Amino acid sequence: MARNKPLAKKLRLAKAMKQNRRVPVWVIVRTNRRVLTHPKRRHWRRTKLKE
């Protein structure tokens, strides 16, 4: 990927990076481990973003 990115693309990538987190521990504890994963988790090599 280019080192010089347009700002809009950079913001989209940053948002995707922030969304790509695990479920917080307090959620797992509060739901008695009923919620362990979230379906929108993305792996950088398997699933690419629309750019």
UniProtKB/Swiss-Prot annotation:
- An annotated GO cellular component: cytosolic large ribosomal subunit
Cysteine pairs bridged by disulfides in the record: none
What is this protein's gene name? rpl39e
Quote the protein name from its UniProt record. Answer: Large ribosomal subunit protein eL39
Q: Where are the transmembrane segments?
A: none
Q: Name one GO biological process term.
A: translation
Q: Listed GO molecular functions?
A: structural constituent of ribosome
Q: Which Pfam families match?
A: Ribosomal_L39 (PF00832)
Family assignment?
A: Belongs to the eukaryotic ribosomal protein eL39 family.
> What UniProt keywords apply to this chain's record, in alphabetical order?
Ribonucleoprotein, Ribosomal protein
